[in-house]
Amino acid sequence: MGKIKKKGTSGQAKNYITRTQAVRKLQISLPDFRRLCIFKGIYPREPRNKKKASKTSTPNTTFYYTKDIQYLLHEPLLRKFREQKAVAKKIARSLGRGEVGDAARLEKNHAPKLTLDHVIKERYPTFIDALRDLDDALSLLFLFANLPSTAHVPPKTIALCQRLCHEFQHYLITTNSLRKSFLSIKGIYYQATIQGQDIMWLVPYRFVQRVNGDVDYRIMATFVDFYTTLLGFVNFRLYSSIGLRYPPKFDTRSDENGAELAAFTLEGRGVGDAPKAIEAGNTQATTSTNKEVSKEIQAKVDDVIKSAGLDEAKEEPAAETTEESSETIDKFEPAAPEADTLPQPDLSGSEAGSLFAPFTFYISREAPRAPLEFILRAFGCKRIGWDAVLGDGAFTHDETDTRITHQIVDRPQLPESSLPAIPAASKDGSDAVQKVKPGTRIPGRTYVQPQWVWDCINEGKLVRPDLYAPGATLPPHLSPWVKPSRGGYDPKASLAEQEEEGEAELDEDSDEEMEEAANDKKAEAKADVGSESEDEDESVDGGMDVAGTDDDESESEEEEEDFGGFEEEEAASESEDEEEAARTQHQKELEAEAAGLPFSSNGATSDESKKKASQAKKIAAKKRKEEEELERQKMMMSRKKRKLLEKMIYSNKKQSEEAAKLRSKRRKLEKEATK
């Protein structure tokens, strides 16, 4: 006879462990356990059967893999947590004795510091893995970079997040890796392509943030600690890959004056070359004063390069790269006209980086400077000016500068009487920057709203600026990531390109029928009101019921007895339709005669109506034929495939109906606009 298995030694009871058991096994507190799980990427699991996984009768809600907790037993961070707990006890003991100085000394000198370098290397064995997990990191760090400092969010954390985010933005500007952006209700979405990986993150708008008490900032601070370490590693690797020194030089005074991106100076590190400062936002390129290589070493290096023939080898690939860059991007077309649309390759980084290169922009005070500066620089613009109130780092603070080609304005057109007066310049010439009256238009300059910049980068080309003039109704700002599907509504395409055969004519006929029905109802209502008034005037019965004659009763009995079936009713309805058509024809003749026109001039309408009716019949016959063919094909399918086909047809029909509604709405709006 075999051994009886003990309960909880195999199966789900062995594979899963509760959170309370895990905390006891690791011998740490619950907050430290949460931090450790966040750092190591260990998350709760849901067993198939909670009853079998639980060793007790209490309804447990949080389970972990037993192997994950066993893996945490060997984590070096556990020793740091225990050291922190011991130091916290000593600090509490000193504060209890009233020894504040000793407590401050213990906190400053003996508090252990956590290092997450080994955790980053364990979780991301390759650099591509780190790039794939960068979306949430950037979104959270950009969020904390825009938060106000509170007791839960210290200023050091905010400054660290701002510095890391600006360093990452500088890499995107230098390599022209930014691809798309979208203005949404939540904030501004950005998408960049780095080493073939698409990275998307969200940046909140710069409004006054109100920190609520219902948010657990301890958990978010743990994620911030991990993500700052991760982004620091990523920035170092990215800067090293393009030959830049990391971290870049940071000007604290310029940052205090609101320079932001312009407070950083990027330096290249070349073999045998002195580092050169890369223009990051300042108008004048600052040259770095670093250690110069001695002339003797440089001469020896040049001799070695010439003797090895490396300089000639370098020239050949350069010529090849220029030839490759001159080639146009291939366009992939489907083999069949009804096949799926193939994704087309995007613009290269060099083409995207030169979109705004030949222009000089000036950002007005009411426009959002930070996102506009980042996007314009990422797409090749080197000269961006703004008002001195917005901070340092501008190409020019003078709004009347003749080199400015585009000005971004985000205020409506106001009458001159409502505009404020401009103070006169001082006589001693202290006010070097000339003030311009609000609403003034300088000749030779293009004025656009901020949406023009976003639509240009999403389209990959410069769109018409007259559609984005100040005060104009802007075109819809569409998401660049939503691609129109087959049979769906495409707001960018014209109606003629996407509407089905005869859809416009049928829509017009339905609109005309609805208008005619509304007019008929109005006419009937007026006629009813007139007949009621006539009845009131001509009533002689005095409110008494008058008995009908015998002839009337016999006529009603004959009408009830004379029922010849449904065929006679259909014939009668057809005759009534013919009489109605003749009546309308006669009415049109009378209207033409009253207008002094021959009726032949109005005959075109009847011909058009006949053509529309025949076309509608053809379309209906064609649809009926297609449906019959589809039914014949479904008969040859198996039940499983037939059910699947019916689901597909149903979903496609719903999508086409929604698209038809949107096209009809757009058709009406365009018709009203042309009136």
UniProtKB/Swiss-Prot annotation:
Q: Where is the composition biased (Acidic residues)?
A: 497-517, 531-540, 548-580
Per the record, where are the segments of Basic residues compositional bias? 612-623
Its lineage reads: Eukaryota, Fungi, Dikarya, Ascomycota, Pezizomycotina
- InterPro entries per the record? BRCT_dom (IPR001357), BRCT_dom_sf (IPR036420), PES (IPR010613)
What Gene3D superfamilies is this protein classified in? Answer: BRCT domain
Subunit-structure text: Component of the NOP7 complex, composed of erb1, nop7 and ytm1. The complex is held together by erb1, which interacts with nop7 via its N-terminal domain and with ytm1 via a high-affinity interaction between the seven-bladed beta-propeller domains of the 2 proteins. The NOP7 complex associates with the 66S pre-ribosome.
Pfam families per record: Pescadillo_N (PF06732)
- PROSITE patterns referenced in this protein's UniProt entry, alphabetically: BRCT
Give coiled-coil spans as residue ranges: 567-675
Q: Which UniProt keywords apply?
A: Coiled coil, Nucleus, Ribosome biogenesis, rRNA processing
Q: What is this protein called?
A: Pescadillo homolog
User: Is the keyword Glycoprotein assigned to this protein?
Assistant: no
Q: Which Gene Ontology BP annotations are present?
A: maturation of 5.8S rRNA from tricistronic rRNA transcript (SSU-rRNA, 5.8S rRNA, LSU-rRNA); maturation of LSU-rRNA from tricistronic rRNA transcript (SSU-rRNA, 5.8S rRNA, LSU-rRNA)
Q: Where in the cell is it found?
A: Nucleus, Nucleolus; Nucleus, Nucleoplasm
